[in-house]
Amino acid sequence: MLSRLLKCKIHRAVVTHAELHYEGSCAIDGVLMDLAGIREYEEIHVWNVTNGKRFTTYAIRGEDNSGIISVNGGAAHQADVGDLVIIATFGDFTEAEANAHKPRLVYANPDNTVNHTANCIPVQVA
């Protein structure tokens, strides 16, 4: 049996473009994609922290070090420039793989540069 686990995420990136008439997708700064381990054309989940909307699309590579996070096509109705988003991917793992798995977590600054990276989320305390 396979378990679906968080593979990677970019946490609190800022939407820089919302392009309704661009071919659907989400363009992500190539440096952020590489650090997170997101592949071009990979399915991504986008969770809009600002308005609570969630949607699924695919990633395309944006210019390296540009800071671009562009929500394109119909998904542009789900995000506005300046919104905070979390971009995540998931993977299916065998039990042995799941036991050893650590997600790749990239935390963004407000200009979409990298604040820090991690491979675990701290325990939430009451």
Swiss-Prot record:
Q: In which pathway does it act?
A: Cofactor biosynthesis; (R)-pantothenate biosynthesis; beta-alanine from L-aspartate: step 1/1
| Enzyme Commission number | 4.1.1.11
Tell me the GO molecular function terms: aspartate 1-decarboxylase activity
Q: Which GO terms describe its cellular component?
A: cytosol
Source taxon at top rank: Bacteria
Q: Name one GO biological process term.
A: pantothenate biosynthetic process
Q: Which CDD domains does the annotation name?
A: Asp_decarbox
Q: Which UniProt keywords apply?
A: Autocatalytic cleavage, Cytoplasm, Decarboxylase, Lyase, Pantothenate biosynthesis, Pyruvate, Schiff base, Zymogen
According to the record, how does the cofactor bind?
Binds 1 pyruvoyl group covalently per subunit.
**Sites bearing Pyruvic acid (Ser), chain numbering:** S25
The family line of this record is:
Belongs to the PanD family.
Which NCBIfam families does the annotation name?
Answer: panD (TIGR00223)
On assembly, the entry states: Heterooctamer of four alpha and four beta subunits.
Protein name listed in UniProt: Aspartate 1-decarboxylase
Q: Which organism is it from?
A: Acinetobacter baumannii (strain ATCC 17978 / DSM 105126 / CIP 53.77 / LMG 1025 / NCDC KC755 / 5377)
The primary gene name is panD
